[in-house]
Amino acid sequence: MSASTAAPARDRLRIAIQKNGRLAEPARSLLAACGLSWRQSRDKLFCYGESLPVDLLLVRDDDIPGLIADGVCDLGIVGQNELDEQASARRRAGLPAAYHAVRGVGFGQCRLMLAVPEEWEWQGVAQLAGKRIATSYPAILADWLERQGIDASVVELSGSVEIAPRLGTADLICDLVSSGATLAANQLKPVELVMESEAVLAGAVREPADARAALLAMLLRRMDGVLKLRDSKLLMFRAEQGNVDALRRLLPDADPLVQLPDDGNGALRLQTMCHGAVTWQRLEELERAGAQGLMVLTVERSLA
């Protein structure tokens, strides 16, 4: 075991992620791609970092902002919706900002939307006046209603929001929507977007100034490298000099072409990093424009 891994407990970086749920596996995979590995405790709530002094806490997603605010952990991967909800609640309670979104992590996309019974004829937000809206995000919804100038009642529920209209406890709902299947199953239809959300890496407003600062900087650099390359491919091919400009125009989402040492066949050897989809149709189009020996390679990590 290295000296850095055996560092004192709070010289170690702590990251909270969802124990179960739709963000759990993508979050763990992202951190593993950054070179982190762990030894899990018996209670399966704490994972001790083995490759680096970076530990994991496996918790409920709505606990993550509070753990960051209290200094229990330094970072967390959580939905922007959950982060904004608790930040708004803190602001309404007169508490200072304690955390912020450091960067998006490219998964967990969803929308917080108003949904009404299917029989409603939706005519716009003015229709909400005097209505009861059930939600698990009361602070976000209250802020949104204020911006819209609408006086409506917010009914806070911790779960099963979609059945509130059928139970008579609300007229409509404000809830997260991914595919819309749950709404349709409960005879509801989405009508108004309240916010777009995705998973984010959240951190404390006041960053650590001790040994954790270097760990944080290293982790963020690695994560940027992973995220940049997540949908990228290395494209390699040969081409005659006269075809290079035409090929470059077919690669608007790619880095500048890099010329490799000549292989003795007369053609240029070129490579570039493509940041969009590299489909069969795209390869065939490049071939027609003069590219030869096309190869598409997956790139796992990069330091830029």
Curated annotation (Swiss-Prot):
InterPro entries: ATP-PRT_HisG_long, ATP_PRibTrfase_cat, ATP_PRibTrfase_CS, ATP_PRibTrfase_HisG, HisG_C, N-reg_PII/ATP_PRibTrfase_C. PANTHER family: ATP PHOSPHORIBOSYLTRANSFERASE (PTHR21403:SF8), ATP PHOSPHORIBOSYLTRANSFERASE ATP-PRTASE (PTHR21403). Its cofactor is Mg(2+). Gene3D superfamilies: 3.30.70.120, Periplasmic binding protein-like II. GO terms for biological process: L-histidine biosynthetic process. Belongs to the ATP phosphoribosyltransferase family. Long subfamily. Keywords: Amino-acid biosynthesis, ATP-binding, Cytoplasm, Glycosyltransferase, Histidine biosynthesis, Magnesium, Metal-binding, Nucleotide-binding, Transferase. Its main location: cytoplasm. Feedback inhibited by histidine. Disulfide bonds: none annotated. It comes from Xanthomonas campestris pv. campestris (strain B100). The gene is hisG. It catalyses: 1-(5-phospho-beta-D-ribosyl)-ATP + diphosphate = 5-phospho-alpha-D-ribose 1-diphosphate + ATP. The lineage of its organism: Bacteria, Pseudomonadati, Pseudomonadota, Gammaproteobacteria, Lysobacterales. This is ATP phosphoribosyltransferase. Its EC number is 2.4.2.17.
